[in-house]
């Protein structure tokens, strides 16, 4: 099974991806996580350091694939999850899709691409150009990390459009949304009512999820020394269990930009109006 994880920049895709990878490994699967971001920090919480990228390694070998060995590019991280960082082209030049293609090509040359039960692509931000949509060419399922906010859902809608487009020519489905670090899901529910997409999980608004990134550890590793965090692991294990059932998924029908803007902005305005009414009612009560 091949998964591609997308979402708005800064929403917590890499943190979510790493914990899902470990959850899948805990279920007995052999997992490879491929970071598809020029920052090459997708697997940082798994390995504890920034591993060399595929592109850096190929450049050092003058692009002689026959001189590259698996141990040059594949690093084992926490929980037995293997890690690869694709890297990216120089700033302002090249195409990220080409880099992803070269990564897959090299892994196939090394006979590594088909050795894993699960390959998870953790993809740069909410970029949905043809280049960074390239991992969708290889994926069975796409997951979108979001929160209960306007910007994240707007990005999710654009990514859903990319999934629909790729699904025309590839056996790709959208597995669902993962809401990261939120106490509410009312705006998410409003969106999925109009654009039916499964919600796989709603992760709690827990500061330790954000701090884990700074510590360079996954929540699974942190929980070994902080037992109070053990309850959070069940959220990721639940996502893993749903994915392992090979869900039907959906080919989404995204909303038009103006339609989505109207839907989400009306939701906020209605909340503000309702809040104003409630304040007035309370004030009248006290005046009486």
Swiss-Prot record:
Q: What does this protein do?
A: Component of the dark-operative protochlorophyllide reductase (DPOR) that uses Mg-ATP and reduced ferredoxin to reduce ring D of protochlorophyllide (Pchlide) to form chlorophyllide a (Chlide). This reaction is light-independent. The L component serves as a unique electron donor to the NB-component of the complex, and binds Mg-ATP.
Q: List positions binding ATP.
A: 10-15, 39, 180-181, 204-206
Q: Which cofactor does it need?
A: [4Fe-4S] cluster
**This protein's pathway:** Porphyrin-containing compound metabolism; chlorophyll biosynthesis (light-independent)
Gene assigned in the entry: chlL
Top-level division of the source organism's lineage = Eukaryota
Report the main location listed first in the record: plastid
Q: Which family does it belong to?
A: Belongs to the NifH/BchL/ChlL family.
* Cofactor descriptive note: Binds 1 [4Fe-4S] cluster per dimer.
Q: What is its EC number?
A: 1.3.7.7
Oligomer status and interactors: Homodimer. Protochlorophyllide reductase is composed of three subunits; ChlL, ChlN and ChlB.
Q: What is this protein called?
A: Light-independent protochlorophyllide reductase iron-sulfur ATP-binding protein
* Gene Ontology CC terms, in alphabetical order: chloroplast
Per its record, the protein catalyses: chlorophyllide a + oxidized 2[4Fe-4S]-[ferredoxin] + 2 ADP + 2 phosphate = protochlorophyllide a + reduced 2[4Fe-4S]-[ferredoxin] + 2 ATP + 2 H2O
Database matches in InterPro entries: NifH/chlL_CS (IPR030655), NifH/frxC (IPR000392), P-loop_NTPase (IPR027417), Protochlorophyllide_ATP-bd (IPR005971)
